[in-house]
Amino acid sequence: DLHRRRHSFPTRRSSDLGVVLQCNNFEIVDLGVMVSCETILKTAREVGADIIGLSGLITPSLDEMVHVAKEMERQGFKLPLLIGGATTSKAHTAVKIEQNYSEPVVYVSNASRAVGVAQSLLNPELKPAFVARIDKEYEIARDQHARKQPRSKPVSLAHARANRHQLDWVGYEPPKPRELGVQTFEDVPVSVLRPYIDWTPFFLSWELAGKYPRILEDEIIGEEATKLFADANAMLDQLEQDKSVRCAGIIGLFPANGVGDSIEVYSDESRTEVIKVLHHLRQQSEKQGFPNYCLADYVAPKESGKPDWIGAFAVTGGIGEEAIAQAYKADHDDYNAILIQAVCDRLAEAFAEYLHEQVRKVHWGYAPDEALSNEELIRENYQGIRPAPGYPACPEHTEKGSIWELLGVEQAIGMKLTESYAMWPGAAVSGWYFSHPESKYFAVAQIQPDQVEDYAQRKGMTLVEAERWLGPNLN
C-alpha cells in the first residue's frame, strides 16, 4: 500500500496523482491542503505509510517542502519522499530538498510517472538501481545549477533604477476612471463568462499539449481532447442550469502615483492621505538598449505633478466547487471531481478576462469603443495589463495582502488568503490594473542582495523574511 498525503500548502489538481495511483492498487490517504508538517508526519506514522508525497502550487510551498524533509531526517523516517506540483522542478528538488534527507527524494513531473516511481521505490529488487539512477541525475542537476551562468550580467540597484523605463509624462494625460472606488460582482452567470474561456490551458492541465481549437483535430490526441471538451461543456451546461457554483468578483479603482519602485495609493483625489503603498521589484540584469523594467514605472511619478490611478481586482469561479468535488469523490467518481476543478479554474480566468474588459470599456472607461474577439483577448491585443502577485512581473506573494486590504475582499465576497498567501477558493485570480498604453508584462527574474535589502526596508520586513519570500528570484 502507498499512503500518500498532499502537501501542507494549497495545490490545484491535488487529486490527479492520487487517482492514478489508486487505479493501480495503491491505497491513498489524502490529507487535503494547508496541513502542518507535524500532522503529515504524525499521520504517516499512524497509518503505516510506505511513501509520503508533497505537492505545491505556489512558491512558499517550496520552503515548506524543505522543512518537511529536514523534519523527516531529524525524526529518523525511513520512507521515500515524492515531490510534485506546479512550482517544483528536478533542479529545485536536487539543490534544495534532496540533500536534507538521507532516504530517496524523487521529483515526479506528472501524474502519469507516479506509478512507475512508486513501484520502483517499493520493490526491493528494483529500488537499488532506481535510487542509484536518481542520485546520479540529481548530481548532474546540482552540477549544472552550480555552473549555470546568468544570461546577462547583474547590475546594481542604482544602475537599474537609472535605466528605468522613461515614459513621456509631459505629453501624456493619464485617463481618469469614470467610477472610482470599490465595486462588487456577487453572482456573474456562467453563461456570461463562457465565451471568455481560454481552452488551451484546460487541455494542458490534463497533460494534453496543443492549441485550441486545433487540438481537437490532432491525429494522436484529438479524439481524447474532443471527448474531454464535450464533458467540460456538459458540465458548464449543468452549472448554468443548477447554479451550484457561484462566480464572484470585486474591483477597485484608486488615485495613485509612483514613488521610486513603489506606488502610493490615496484615499481620494486630494492625494493627501496614503492608504496603501504597493511595493514592486526592478529587473536587475544588464540590458543592451532596453530599460530595467519595474511596474511602478507605469504610474505617473509623484514629482511629475500628473494625477494617475491604479486598479485592483480579485475573482473566483469556484464558490461551491469544493462541495461538488467532494460529492463526486464520495460517489467514487474521481474523473468528474477533477473535471469540476479544471472547469472552475477556467471560469476564474474567464472572469478575470471579462472583468478587465469591463474595466477598460466601462468602469475606468479609457477604451470605450474596444471590440475584440476572444482570440484577440487571449493575445492581449488591448491597452493596459493586469499583472498578478506571484507571477513574473510582481513575483512576491505577500503583495496580495494589499489587494485584500484595499478591496475588503474577504468581507465582500468570501475569498481568503492562506498563511502562505495562496487564494481560497483555489479557482481564483487577483491582481492589479495598469492603464498606460506602453505598460507590458516582463519577468523581474534574478535580483541582487542590494535590492533584497531595499525591499525588506520598504516592506518593513526582516532580511530573513524578505529572502524567504523572494527565494525564487535569488541565486
Where on the chain are the PLM-derived regions?
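Generic, well-ordered alpha-helical scaffold segments in large soluble proteins
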Residues: V19-N24, T43, V47, V68-Q75, ...
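Short, small-residue-biased leader/transition segments that mark boundaries at the very start
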Residues: D1-H3, H7-S14
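Active-site loops and adjacent core secondary-structure elements that bind or stabilize anionic groups
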Residues: T11, S112-I338, A342, H363, ...
